[in-house]
Amino acid sequence: LVVMEDAKVDDVIRNLITSGYGCAGQRCMASSVIVTVGKKIHDEILPKYLQAAKDVVVANPLDPAVADEQMLMGPVISAQAKKFVEDMIETGVKEGATLAVDGRGLVVPGCENGHFLGTSVFTDVKVGMDIHNVEIFGPVQSIMNVDTLDDAIQIINDHPYGNGCSLYTQNGYWARKFKIEAQSGMIGINVGIPAPVAYLPFGGMK
């Protein structure tokens, strides 16, 4: 998910959270990699985004006490999935990325044996790191900053996966350029996750 300098910040923050942490990140098009273009927008978004990630409520979705929560996250699907996500978080730390939000070690009352993880966010991520290249399939997002839209498109096109990507901008030229040049099965403009037509194949072909 690419964020340009003219993006509407509140819309970006809301959709970063819902697209990254909905279904505990267990979606083939979850926004796991965020690229901001320009230092100004990066510095504006980062603190708000980190706080929004921390504010995600992790709980038993069947608990009536959390029925009115706007952003509620349940468990990952299995103990194996939880361990894989935790191992990937540890890998990111060892690779030198900064773990700005750490979702490990979370315990949900009444579900002590559940496979729950909180939200995790990495900053200072570099192309080539495993946390950038591997599909983690869990509640983990990475955010990185580049200078130009061309740089962001290059990151997309060099990535091993290409199921879906999005651009946040109010600029029609940037939107058209992104639509033409980004190599991805589905491309969205000002949406968190491009909506697939479910009865047609969407295998992430570049």
Task: Describe the function of each predicted region.
Residues 37, 139, 171:
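Short, conserved phosphate/pyrophosphate- and ester-handling motifs at nucleotide-, phospho-/glycolipid
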Residues 1-126, 148-150, 155, 189:
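ALDH superfamily catalytic-core signature
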Residues 45, 105-123, 149-206:
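C-terminal core of ALDH-fold dehydrogenases
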Residues 69-72, 114-117, 134-140, 159-163:
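Conserved glycine-rich beta-strand-loop-beta hairpin in the small C-terminal domain of fold type I
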Residues 128-133:
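Cytochrome P450 core scaffold surrounding the K-helix E-X-X-R motif
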Residues 66-70, 137, 199-206:
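Short glycine/proline- and charge-enriched loop/turn segments
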Residues 143-147:
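Short acidic-hydrophobic, aromatic-tinged amphipathic segments that line or gate anion-handling sites
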Residues 1, 141-142:
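Short beta-strand->loop structural element characteristic of the AMP-binding/adenylate-forming
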